[in-house]
Amino acid sequence: KLAGEKAVAYAMGGAPYYVVRTSWLYGPNGKNFVATITRLLNEKPELKVVNDQFGSPTYTMDLALAVLQNFIFPRELLASGIYHLTNSGTTTWYEFAKEIATLKKSETPVIPIATEDYPLPAKRPQHSTLINTKLPKLRDWKAGLEHFLEKYPV
């Protein structure tokens, strides 16, 4: 990732550029954690979800709006560089799944487990939380999730 970010800066040759880092994206299109958990809540008697990996779930519509407001139609030109854009707050995959279950009014138990108890083909970082210090903060991840599930019942 870092090499790609450096390549962008080099390729721009001094012209303004922006690299946006984000995490744990979900939205109305494609496969994502919210859609998967919603489906599994209806299919499985219980869900086991890792509780020791931390991040900031980010609603794609919030991200798109922030990109438009800050980079495409900004009030003032920003300095070139790397910007973090995620919904505010930090959670675990387990807490994220629990919140989805609560908002969906599901009675399927969601059980916390350790990463080591959930085999994945690729190792995941324990902390992928990004701190947004250069731009206005986006709404809390729970508010974004609630809005998403009201607007796009998956």
Language model segments and positions:
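Active-site helix adjacent to the Tyr-X3-Lys
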Residues: 2-6
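NAD(P)-dependent short-chain dehydrogenase/reductase
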Residues: 7-55, 61-62, 68
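Short aromatic/basic micro-patch
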Residues: 19, 57, 90, 112, ...
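An accessory alpha-helical subdomain
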Residues: 23, 49, 54-58, 83-96
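Mid/C-terminal beta-alpha module of Rossmann-like enzyme folds, strongest
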Residues: 66, 73-121, 126
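C-terminal amphipathic/interface module of NAD(P)-dependent oxidoreductases
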Residues: 108, 123-154
